[in-house]
């Protein structure tokens, strides 16, 4: 039996989120609806999640001592990493000492904080199908890896980055240095290490949201949402839709891969498993042990969206991944470099049938920073995609 307390009282169930962007904000809202006391942590003040949490804290989360001091001061029941750039060795030490429970586990947070840990787990430990790959610490190593078997075309990514930053495709020798420089500029921390992957000529890529939650018998069970299709530009998602049609064999293989990798990572919660698909063939790409940006579409397609599923699963509550209606999401970019922007056209956007908007409340806009998302549902995915893109296009961010 799960018992939940009352916020801001001695009985409170306290959850701390490390990372409070637009995804963290929705998790915090889902937790608050269940009467959980929330602590939103980020590296900058007034982050989206901090605007809705009971408590807002600003620290350098990659600094182990700062992280330890905050956790010991706040004494949360659960710590929920929402980004990669966190001092995971400290989380492992605190979890091992019984100070706090990390979602899904501190080991999972460490393995998924960069592309190397999770790729080696998937390909070398679990034997799951992936693209051919090498890890490189210099431009010379990158060139040697390409010449030694990876070949052209290939994809280069920093071992640690988010939202596609630093990711590029190399079509020939003339592109190698530019790709290395771009990866170095786009890495989340100063790491100087990249993964180079042989290019898979896939038909499409999906996100398979996978939930590990406690069932009625007290055992952890694995649940799958309907597959989410998405379009990425330079590694960053620009639209997604659910469900994405798949060959039954490919869906079965996708679920097998997702079950294997999430079972090894362990714990409870929602995972975003990214996969490449060609016909009946499936390759593992990446996994995030938390809600996924492409999964924002579930705010309009599912009875319980990905954020509610994550909140329920980490609290030991039952979950349902049932689909409510086909739907789509389309990103709204800042388009300007400014603080405290305003949005024109919100009324026009919401006149598009069966649409919703989420404006994230980020304090500062950049040209390609994700500032909101349009959501739409319809009788079919194609109509929903058209509506979402139309609504997103009517929202016009500008300087105040």
Swiss-Prot record:
GO CC term, one of those recorded: cytosol
Binding site for N(1)-(5-phospho-beta-D-ribosyl)glycinamide: 22-23, 82, 293, 362, 369-370
Pfam families (UniProt xref): ATP-grasp, PurT_C, RS_preATP-grasp-like
Alphabetized PROSITE patterns for the sequence: ATP_GRASP
GO molecular function, one term: magnesium ion binding
ATP-grasp domain mapped to chain residues: 120-315
Binding site for ATP: 115, 157, 162-167, 197-200, 205
SUPFAM superfamilies the record matches: Glutathione synthetase ATP-binding domain-like, PreATP-grasp domain, Rudiment single hybrid motif
This protein's pathway: Purine metabolism; IMP biosynthesis via de novo pathway; N(2)-formyl-N(1)-(5-phospho-D-ribosyl)glycinamide from N(1)-(5-phospho-D-ribosyl)glycinamide (formate route): step 1/1
InterPro entries the UniProt entry points to: ATP-grasp, ATP-grasp_carboxylate-amine, ATP_grasp_subdomain_1, PreATP-grasp_dom_sf, PurT, PurT/PurK_preATP-grasp, PurT_C, Rudment_hybrid_motif
Enzyme Commission designation: 6.3.1.21
Record keywords, A-Z: ATP-binding, Ligase, Magnesium, Metal-binding, Nucleotide-binding, Purine biosynthesis
Binding site for Mg(2+): 274, 286
Catalysed transformations (reactions): N(1)-(5-phospho-beta-D-ribosyl)glycinamide + formate + ATP = N(2)-formyl-N(1)-(5-phospho-beta-D-ribosyl)glycinamide + ADP + phosphate + H(+)
Biological process, per Gene Ontology: 'de novo' IMP biosynthetic process
Sequence similarity: Belongs to the PurK/PurT family.
HAMAP family linked to this entry: PurT
NCBIfam families named among the record's database cross-references: PRK09288.1, purT
The protein's assembly and partners: Homodimer.
Function: Involved in the de novo purine biosynthesis. Catalyzes the transfer of formate to 5-phospho-ribosyl-glycinamide (GAR), producing 5-phospho-ribosyl-N-formylglycinamide (FGAR). Formate is provided by PurU via hydrolysis of 10-formyl-tetrahydrofolate.
Protein name: Formate-dependent phosphoribosylglycinamide formyltransferase
Native species: Cupriavidus metallidurans (strain ATCC 43123 / DSM 2839 / NBRC 102507 / CH34) (Ralstonia metallidurans)
